[in-house]
Amino acid sequence: MMASYPEPENASGALLAPETGRAAKEPEAPPPPSPGKGGGGGTGTAPEKPDPAQKPPYSYVALIAMAIRESAEKRLTLSGIYQYIIAKFPFYEKNKKGWQNSIRHNLSLNECFIKVPREGGGERKGNYWTLDPACEDMFEKGNYRRRRRMKRPFRPPPAHFQPGKGLFGAGGAAGGCGVAGAGADGYGYLAPPKYLQSGFLNNSWPLPQPPSPMPYASCQMAAAAAAAAAAAAAAGPGSPGAAAVVKGLAGPAASYGPYSRVQSMALPPGVVNSYNGLGGPPAAPPPPPHPHSHPHAHHLHAAAAPPPAPPHHGAAAPPPGQLSPASPATAAPPAPAPTNAPGLQFACARQPELAMMHCSYWDHDSKTGALHSRLDL
């Protein structure tokens, strides 16, 4: 009996050994977390400490408004806004130059932010920034991700666009090139360029000058011819005054050279008729000009020399060797006139229509000469 007793003990110990080994190894495995303990602890700390590598989902306007609202005095300087954003969101610790420029632009351009100057003048640099009272509720119930659309408050226009002032400055109006209505207190945005002002116009761009008048010599000679015609018509035919007036025109005409306008100008018929003592136009055409242009001695006449007595109708005819006094080309040349005496000096080649005026037989008052009898035929 004693031999059979210890066998079951060994057998039972051998059978229980693996069970005890398994029980010792089971506590090493971590127990499964309970759903009520671990879930709440992990989710509660995540919003308080955001990921530094992730950009916050807020606009720059929301970041500025958040910093101003959470300040003690409801206003902050630019450096105070920077410090709040860096402390609140570590993402902005890097690349400060980029986002800080965006913060400054939003402060200057957005009407929701008002600049408040510091007290005490220029002792400390920087101004305060605060929120406009009309924009306090621009974020619905503190949700900075959604911004409410609001009407912009009315503000007076800036100084450079005030109504009642012209766009042209005082410099443009003073220069003479400004538009009408430009006051002296204008802004000068549309001032004319310098090259259109009066100082430049006088030097480089002169104003067009009026056309030059007629030459003085032409006007003087035309007036003298008209006066001579009027005087000759008033004095009557054959008067010595008319002859003197017409002969006086040769003085200024001779001083202009051989190609003067006066020498190429024909006298009106009234002047010629009053000069030669005839009432009607000449019956015969003037003789042809000479083929040569050198002056002859019979072309010079003295204004004061008395004409010779013409022959009468009852006188005897001249001998065959003597020419008739009616031919002016072969008449005996009179005494030469002095240099200072006025007289007509016309060349035959240049004035064919006035060749008959050189004969001195036309200066008499009687109409019984041989010349008149020939012209009446």
From Swiss-Prot:
InterPro entries: FH_FOXL2 (IPR047515), Fork_head_dom (IPR001766), FOX_domain-containing (IPR050211), TF_fork_head_CS_1 (IPR018122), TF_fork_head_CS_2 (IPR030456), WH-like_DNA-bd_sf (IPR036388), WH_DNA-bd_sf (IPR036390). The modification Phosphoserine is found at residue 34. Gene3D superfamilies: Winged helix-like DNA-binding domain superfamily/Winged helix DNA-binding domain. Residues 55-149 bind DNA. Coiled coil: none annotated. It comes from the Eukaryota. One of its GO terms (cellular component) is nucleus. Sumoylated with SUMO1; sumoylation is required for transcriptional repression activity. Pfam families: Forkhead. GO terms for biological process: anatomical structure morphogenesis; apoptotic DNA fragmentation; cell differentiation; embryonic eye morphogenesis; extraocular skeletal muscle development; female somatic sex determination; granulosa cell differentiation; negative regulation of DNA-templated transcription. Residues 1-54, 277-338 are annotated as: Disordered. Keywords: Differentiation, DNA-binding, Isopeptide bond, Nucleus, Phosphoprotein, Transcription, Transcription regulation, Ubl conjugation. There is a cross-link at residue 25 (Glycyl lysine isopeptide (Lys-Gly) (interchain with G-Cter in SUMO)). The keyword Transferase does not apply. It is found in: Nucleus. Residues 305-322 have a biased composition (Pro residues). GO terms for molecular function: cysteine-type endopeptidase regulator activity involved in apoptotic process; DNA binding; DNA-binding transcription factor activity; DNA-binding transcription factor activity, RNA polymerase II-specific; RNA polymerase II cis-regulatory region sequence-specific DNA binding; ubiquitin conjugating enzyme binding. Residues 291-301 have a biased composition (Basic residues). Interacts with ESR1. Interacts with UBE2I/UBC9. Interacts with SMAD3. Interacts with DDX20. Transcriptional regulator. Critical factor essential for ovary differentiation and maintenance, and repression of the genetic program for somatic testis determination. Prevents trans-differentiation of ovary to testis through transcriptional repression of the Sertoli cell-promoting gene SOX9. Has apoptotic activity in ovarian cells. Suppresses ESR1-mediated transcription of PTGS2/COX2 stimulated by tamoxifen. Activates SIRT1 transcription under cellular stress conditions. Activates transcription of OSR2. Is a regulator of CYP19 expression. Is a transcriptional repressor of STAR. This is Forkhead box protein L2.
